[in-house]
Amino acid sequence: MDKKSSRLRRATRARKKIQELGVHRLVVHRTPRHIYAQVINPEAQVVAAASTVEKSIKEALKSTGNVDAAKAVGKAIAERAVEKGVTVVAFDRSGFKYHGRVAALADAAREAGLQF
């Protein structure tokens, strides 16, 4: 089993448990160059999204693949979700370690008003 398939296996297990809870989930995906976040409702519809690919977020950043970029995305996704009336979510880290950029995004989202 390689690194990617292990991550996907962890992600599948976590998503199944979140699905059983029936709550909104904050999904995070990261690549070496960008980080993406979505709030998805129990019916699998995207409620809010933010990423470093967006022009408004990218303009304010020096680099899109670092912790500062993750903090900006976390703040943006939380503001957009709260604006749509979603304040409580389950954090879906997509099998990535809760460390570095993933943890920074989560902390920024909590500070901006999301509860998980």
Swiss-Prot record:
<keyword id="KW-0687">Ribonucleoprotein</keyword>
<dbReference type="GO" id="GO:0022625">
    <property type="term" value="C:cytosolic large ribosomal subunit"/>
</dbReference>
<keyword id="KW-0689">Ribosomal protein</keyword>
<dbReference type="InterPro" id="IPR004389">
    <property type="entry name" value="Ribosomal_uL18_bac-type"/>
</dbReference>
<dbReference type="GO" id="GO:0003735">
    <property type="term" value="F:structural constituent of ribosome"/>
</dbReference>
<dbReference type="Pfam" id="PF00861">
    <property type="entry name" value="Ribosomal_L18p"/>
</dbReference>
<dbReference type="GO" id="GO:0008097">
    <property type="term" value="F:5S rRNA binding"/>
</dbReference>
<dbReference type="InterPro" id="IPR005484">
    <property type="entry name" value="Ribosomal_uL18_bac/euk"/>
</dbReference>
<comment type="function">
    <text>This is one of the proteins that bind and probably mediate the attachment of the 5S RNA into the large ribosomal subunit, where it forms part of the central protuberance.</text>
</comment>
<protein>
    <recommendedName>
        <fullName>Large ribosomal subunit protein uL18</fullName>
    </recommendedName>
</protein>
<comment type="similarity">
    <text>Belongs to the universal ribosomal protein uL18 family.</text>
</comment>
<dbReference type="GO" id="GO:0006412">
    <property type="term" value="P:translation"/>
</dbReference>
<keyword id="KW-0699">rRNA-binding</keyword>
<comment type="subunit">
    <text>Part of the 50S ribosomal subunit; part of the 5S rRNA/L5/L18/L25 subcomplex. Contacts the 5S and 23S rRNAs.</text>
</comment>
<keyword id="KW-0694">RNA-binding</keyword>
